[in-house]
Amino acid sequence: MNMKLKAYFYYDIISPYVYLFLKSRKILEDKLELIPVPIFFPGLLRLQENTGPAEVPEKRIYTYQFCVWKAQKLNLPFQLPRRHPFASAPAQRILLQNNADLAMLDKAFDFVWGQGHDPELEWEDFCVAIGLSKNTPKPQDEKIKKALIESTQTAAHHGVFGVPSIRIDQQVFWGVDSIDWILEYLNKPEMFSEKEFQIAHSIINPLLEK
C-alpha cells in the first residue's frame, strides 16, 4: 500500500471558502494525507500588509454571493451568519487546543457556514457542536495563544497568503477552485519547473521599483 503524500491544510473558520473546500475535499483525500493547520487569517493579512475581502465593501458582497452560488452548484447547505467578520481567534484557539481533525472541522464549519451561526456570540452552542462541553471556556492559555501566532507566522514563511491553502512540499495552492490544479500537479510534479511557469518569477513589478 502506497503512503499518501502529506499536504498541510491551512484554515480559519472566518472563511466561507474553507467550508466549500472541506465539502469538496474527498477527491484529494484519495491521494493526500490532509493535515489541518489552524491559523489566524487577520493576523496573516497584517503580516503581509494585505487587505481582506471584508474590508472592501464591493468585494465583501461579491464573496458572500459567490459562496451562495457555489454552494447551490455543489448542492450544499449554506447560510451566512447575521454578522461577519466575527472574531475567529477563540474558535481557532479551541480547535488548535483540541488538535482538531477533519471530522471536528466538519462539525465546526457546518455550525457556522452550513447553519449560519456565530461562534463568537454563540460560544456554548459552538462548543457543543464540535463535541465539547457547553461550559468550555474560551482559551486563555498563553501557550495556546502563542501557538496560533506561531502557526500563522510559519504559514506566512511558507508563502501562504489566504485560506484555504494547501501546501505540498513547498508548493502552495490557494482557494477552493485550486483542487483541479492540485490533482494535475500530483500527476505532473515537475509542472512548476517548466519554462511557462518559471516566467512568473521574472516578471518586473513596477510598483516595487524605486
Where are these regions (language model features)?
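C-terminal cap of thioredoxin/glutaredoxin-like
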Residues: 5-8, 14, 18-32, 107-210
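Structural alpha/beta surface segment adjacent to cysteine/selenocysteine redox centers
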Residues: 13, 17-112, 196-210
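Short, Lys/Arg-enriched N-terminal segments with co-localized hydrophobic residues
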Residues: 1-2
